[in-house]
Amino acid sequence: KVEAQLKVVNEGGSISTDTSGATPAISVSDADAVTLIFACGTDYKMELPNFRGEDPHDAVTERIKAASKKGYETLKADHVADHSALFSRMELGFDEEIPQIPTDELIQKYRNMVENNGGEVPTTAEQRALEVICYQFGRYLTIAGSREGALPTNLQGVWGEGNFAWGGDYHFNINVQMNYWPTLASNLAECQTAYNDYLNVLKKAGRYAAAAAFGIKSNEGEENGWLVGCFSTPYMFSALGQKNNAAGWNPIGSAWALLNAYEYYLYTEDTDYLKNELYPSLKEVANFWNEALYWSEYQQRYVSAPSYSPENGPIVNGASYDQQFIWQHFENTIQAAETLGVDADLVAEWKEKQSKLDPVLVGDDGQVKEWYEETHFGKAQAGDLGEIDIPQWRQSLGAQSGGVQPPHRHLSHLMALYPCNMISKDNPEFMDAAIVSLNERGLDATGWSKAHKLNLWARTGHSKEAFQIVQSAVGGGNSGFLTNLLSSHGGGENYKGYPIFQIDGNFGYTAGVNEMLLQSQ
């Protein structure tokens, strides 16, 4: 149930209402000033099993009354103080002057430069200013959209009218995690509380998914494993799979989700949170994979099966995407257990499994392999069988250009480089292979994918490619930032046909600039 109330406060003049029509109307005449006070609420409560709290009427009514007593100036001062306490914690600048032109015009000038279309282009100072504005806009969206006691941010908003994009869901195969990539390094740790709290409820529903998909059950009082597939909702949908789309199979979702949560601990060093909330979840998912991993005689390693590399190629055993996140999850859980001084017997089991995952494999083109059977780009060979084209390789529905599929927007086989940390400059063989794979994927993409590529290239230390993606994102139009600064997924041919707002591109850009300037692994 949703309730909204609007109060109109006039200074001078007169006010009247008309309820005779289909839509009630409020009219103000000859006023010196008008203040609109709006409040809304729902009876949603983030609590299993029915997610139903109290009727919102009393709370919304009280909020309107309290705001009315404060008045406009006090309300504004409260808002500025609340926002500034978070936003003003850090500054980023390159001695650029703030341009005195509207942002949409500045974006258009920058786009002219990127597209080389002959239009007016920005000065160097204007370029730096806009790049910083886009960075700080990601922090602004974090502050505005993710606060304690609320739901975490998602793709486009949770509560929408009609059949809006992605149904207002949470995508756990990169998107919701990307939303929180910049939060901690941008000194906004409090803004991740909503995400952490959501995971604490999601895991309870996720035990049903683990039982249904893998037969690993948690009876009353047991915590034997929890999963979330590609999609979730405010009502903790966690099932794996999607009709006619392999992308729904994402058993690694919970391990990836907890990577953000573990980084929250690393930044805050909140040992109470680690001990009482996070470690039980880490341990539960580690125990799940300790049981669910399958020893493949053919591959001579433990593998996740069945396995899928979002959103590219066929269903396989041991896709690099799964293997890398399982390795990282074991690593984080082992570190957490050793920090707390607990579960030494389990740590030994986890280390044994982790040592036999072999999560990064190098192919014949020098690339990080996306699948075990991959040989060259787009080719695969299993055992003594002949080499074949990889089924559904580069399948990007709606992105064809002249009948040719562009490089795929997902880079699921490079998670060990970012957001994980198995690939680093300390391992040049793997780093070189990651660079080969990055070059194959190219610099162009849709908005959120550019953001991921920005973080990946930043991790390699290749400033030229990283900055090219900064420019491609800021000046990317329908496959980058729109003139209102919101990031676009981009629909139609080559992701440039028409805009689809998708907020993770904003957050990923901010995270990428963080990585370009300062890295903590």
Write out the residue ranges for each language-model feature.
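Secretory-pathway/luminal and periplasmic proteins that interact with or process carbohydrate-rich
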Residues: 140-151, 165-172, 191, 204-210, ...
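The feature captures the catalytic groove of carbohydrate-active enzymes
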Residues: 46-49, 53-57, 154-169, 222-275, ...
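Flexible glycine/proline-enriched surface loops and loop-helix/loop-strand junctions
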Residues: 20, 122, 161-166, 173-180, ...
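Structural recognition of the beta-strand scaffold that forms the well-ordered cores
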Residues: 37, 133-134, 141-143, 180-182, ...
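Active-site-adjacent bridging/hinge elements
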Residues: 95-113, 149-157, 220-239, 254-261, ...
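Active-site core of glycosidic bond-cleaving carbohydrate-active enzymes
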Residues: 172-175, 184-208, 221, 246-267, ...
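Acidic/polar, glycine-enriched structural segments that form the non-catalytic walls/loops
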Residues: 1-170, 189-211, 341, 400
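Extended, hydrophobic/aromatic-rich amphipathic alpha-helical segments that build helical scaffolds
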Residues: 131-145, 254-263, 279-289
